[in-house]
């Protein structure tokens, strides 16, 4: 008896290699056992999430490709590729959570070693720098369900060359999804640099929305503060400020690297592409200035709330102090005259009780006058 176990992932089965085995007890029978590779969700067996070939002069300017088609196209020399399409380039988007993604890139993409070093260096600040004849970019973006939590920020690594653009991420990001939607709608970037510029503008649009949502939240808190309904939950402002600070730290491009890049761009980058990249960088600067202004508003609100909390605490302490001062004369008098010893004054006096009441009232009035005079 032979048992064949088929491994599936979702509704797909992906064969990798096969081996032939003889079934014992069955004459002339063979068993073909397939070794299946289970890919990560949303990507193929190479970790490729999506791939597009852009050929400006072809009948089909934009064509979706899989990892095998991409490897075949990349194996061509630039001369062979230019004979088929004058300005063709390819965009490949990989899932770094897939074990085969980096191996496939090393085997077929021919990327600079700086790109792989950037994947492992642990530095996630936004930057664009030149490595050999390509551009290496690190862009930070937000997840689809951004809820103003620091964990909702993730990183996109990019390698840009004249024929190939590679983007890689560990978690789904909005900017890549916006680019995929634009490509499917027919808005295809004309060059690899324009694709990078499109990603940067998409990220800037996301930041604008974050600033807008953050402004709405702060406006609501300000209205509550002015109306006297604020519950003093400064944790909301603290979380929002931490997220904005982290966003600004991660998203602010490194000016020195950008300056060097724009001053001496690669030879394959056209002047118009360099100008568009410079314009996208300026958009980033505007959004980051707005984000800095938003942080200042949050800081002022936190100071105002802290002042209100201190004022409430001082008021409560004053009330407790007044109560203590007012109760002090009667407590002292009751303590002295309540002792069960001989020689207590006014013990035999017929008006002794009222005399003590008068003394207590007098000292209480004097203590109250002193306390309220200090308050004024």
Give the location of each predicted region:
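Peripheral, non-transmembrane regulatory/ligand-interaction domains of membrane transport proteins
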Residues: 2-263, 269-270, 283-286, 293, ...
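Hydrophobic alpha-helical transmembrane segments and their immediately adjacent juxtamembrane loops
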Residues: 4-15, 19-22, 282-376
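Long amphipathic alpha-helical coiled-coil segments
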Residues: 262-274, 301-309
């Amino acid at each position: 008896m032979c048992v064949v176990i088929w491994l599936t992932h979702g509704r797909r089965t992906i064969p990798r290699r096969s081996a032939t085995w003889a079934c014992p007890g069955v004459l002339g029978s063979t068993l073909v056992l397939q070794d299946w590779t289970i890919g990560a969700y949303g990507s193929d067996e190479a970790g490729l999430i999506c791939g597009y070939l852009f050929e400006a002069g072809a009948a089909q300017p934009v064509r979706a490709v899989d990892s095998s088609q991409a490897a075949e196209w990349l194996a061509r020399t630039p001369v062979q590729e230019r004979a088929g399409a004058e300005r063709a380039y390819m965009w490949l988007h990989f899932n770094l959570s897939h074990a085969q993604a980096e191996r496939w890139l090393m085997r077929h993409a021919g990327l600079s070693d700086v790109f792989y070093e950037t994947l492992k260096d642990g530095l996630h600040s936004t930057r664009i720098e030149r490595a050999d004849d390509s551009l290496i970019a690190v862009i930070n973006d937000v997840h689809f369900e951004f809820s103003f939590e620091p964990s909702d920020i993730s990183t996109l690594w990019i390698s840009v060359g004249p024929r190939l653009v590679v983007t890689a991420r560990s978690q789904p990001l909005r900017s890549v999804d916006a680019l995929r939607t634009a490509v499917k709608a027919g808005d295809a970037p004309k060059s690899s640099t324009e694709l990078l510029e499109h990603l940067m503008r998409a990220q800037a649009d996301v930041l604008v929305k974050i600033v807008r949502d953050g402004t709405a939240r702060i406006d609501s808190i300000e209205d509550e503060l002015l109306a006297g309904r604020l519950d003093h939950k400064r944790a909301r402002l603290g979380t929002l400020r931490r997220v904005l600070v982290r966003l600004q730290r991660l998203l602010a491009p490194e000016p020195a690297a950008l300056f060097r890049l724009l001053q001496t761009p690669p030879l394959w980058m056209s002047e118009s592409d360099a100008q568009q990249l410079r314009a996208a960088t300026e958009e980033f600067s505007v959004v980051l200035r707005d984000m800095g202004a938003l942080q200042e508003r949050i800081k002022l609100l936190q100071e105002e709330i802290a002042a209100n909390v201190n004022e409430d605490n001082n008021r409560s302490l004053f009330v407790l102090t007044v109560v203590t001062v007012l109760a002090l004369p009667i407590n002292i008098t009751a303590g002295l005259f309540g002792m069960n010893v001989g020689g207590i004054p006014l013990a035999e006096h017929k008006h002794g009780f009222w005399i003590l009441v008068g003394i207590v009232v007098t000292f209480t009035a004097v203590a109250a006058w002193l306390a309220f005079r200090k308050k004024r």
